[in-house]
Amino acid sequence: AVALPATLLRQILSSLAGEWVHLSAGGSGMAHITDGTTHFDLAVVPPDDFPKPLHPASPSLQTRLPAGNLAEAIRRVLHAASKEDNRPNIAGVRLIIAPGGATAVATDGARLAIATLPAEEADAQEPYAFTIPSKTASDLATLLDAENTVLLTASQEVAEFEASLRLSTRTLPHPYPAWSDVVQRASENPTRITAPAATILSAVKLAALTAGSEVRTATLNIRSEVRAVTLDIRERNVTLSSETPELGRSTVPLEATVDGPPARVHLNSTYLVQALTACREAVVTIAVGTPNTPVLVQVQDGIYTEVIAPIRTVSQGADT
C-alpha cells in the first residue's frame, strides 16, 4: 500500500488526455503514473503516516437512506450554516434521523434552514441527531449524486456514509441549539403572501439593486455589510423596496396572494435570495408578523422551510 498527495494526484488525473492511466509503485519510494505518453514519478507518503480510517465505535444508529434525497436536503440548507470560527457548534449541518424520514438543519444565528426528506427505508427506533462539519457535508452531497442509497452508521463521535465510496467524519461535539420552537413561533405569523418562488426571487433581486452594501444598525449604530430590502404587505398590494443615500431608492410590485393584516418588515436581501433559491421552483408562502418577528419562508409541501431574523432599522430603534 502507498499513499499519494491527494490534491496533486487529482490535478494530474484530471489533466491527462488518455482514457486509461497506469499507476505502479515499487520499493523506491516513488509511484509512476502514465497515460502512455505523459509520465509522472511522485514521491509517496509513508502509509504508516496516513491517518487511520474512522469507524463509529458502538454505533447508536445504522440505517439506509435515499442518497439523492439526502444530497438535495444538504444542499438546500448548507448556505445557512455558520461560517464563524467562534461558533463551532453550528458550523455544520445537523442531521436528524427518525422512523420513516430524516431532516437536515443549518443555522448561523440569524437564519435557520430546514429540509425534510421522506425515507421509508429509515429504521431508526427513535430520533437520532448529530452534526457534521460544513465541508464534509458539501463533499458528501457531491459524492451521493450518483448513488441510489447510502448506508449511514453513526455514533456521537463518528458518522460513516457508505455507498460505492465510504466517507467517515468526526461529528461536531458541541451541543446544537434548540430550533423547533423558532419555526413554530414563526409559523404563527398572521400575515401571509403566496407566490411562485421564482416570481418573488426576481422582485427581491430587482429591489436590492439600490440596497447598496451597507445599512446602519439600530442597536450598535455601526455599519455592517448587509443589503436590506423592505417587504411591505397591504390588503391588495405587495411591494419590495430599498433605499440608500448613495444610490437612491426602488419600489418593485409583487404579484402574490395576500392573507392577513398589513405588515412591513426589513430583511437581509442576501438571506432572502438564498432562501428563495433553495425553494427551487415551488410555490412559496412567506409569513410575516411584527417588524421584529422572524419571517417564515416555506414551500407549500413543507419539504423546505427557512426562518430569517429581520433587520432593525434606525427608526425602529429610536421608537423603542
Where are these regions (language model features)?
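Structural preference for solvent-exposed beta-strand-turn elements
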Residues: 1-320
